[in-house]
């Protein structure tokens, strides 16, 4: 497996969070759910979101709660990264929703062609999560 993630750590609130090979964490070490809520509260409503970095899915779940009718394409660097997140966080089943598409950078072009229809989703927002 050639993932950008190497391990998991527990946050101060007891939640598992992925750790990059660099040693950095993708989420807050203290309260990743609070971090996700704060980030979502600073995002205006759009009909289509492209989110780079899935992590444990805290941010995407909160974004879905706030904007349930929006379409979200969530990107990870590789299938190995998605496999790591699925193994440790059940990310595919956790984010199972008709409005969420999980993809890799390699498949991003096709995912956007299949899912982004400007007449249906007139506003588009890129969110670089970490």
Give, region by region, the residue ranges found by the protein language model.
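N-terminal donor/sugar-recognition subdomains of glycan-related enzymes
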Residues: 1-130
């Amino acid at each position: 497996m050639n993932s950008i993630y190497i391990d998991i750590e527990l946050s101060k609130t007891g939640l598992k969070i992925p750790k990059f090979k660099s040693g950095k964490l993708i989420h807050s070490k203290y309260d990743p759910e609070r971090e996700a809520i704060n980030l979502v509260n600073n995002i205006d409503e759009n009909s289509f979101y492209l989110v780079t970095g899935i992590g444990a899915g805290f941010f995407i779940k909160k974004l879905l709660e706030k904007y349930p009718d929006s379409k979200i394409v969530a990107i990870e660097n590789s299938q190995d990264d998605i496999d790591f997140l699925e193994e440790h966080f059940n990310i595919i089943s956790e984010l199972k929703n008709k409005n969420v598409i999980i993809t890799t950078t390699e498949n991003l072009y096709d995912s956007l062609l299949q899912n982004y229809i400007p007449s249906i989703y007139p506003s588009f927002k890129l969110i670089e999560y970490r």
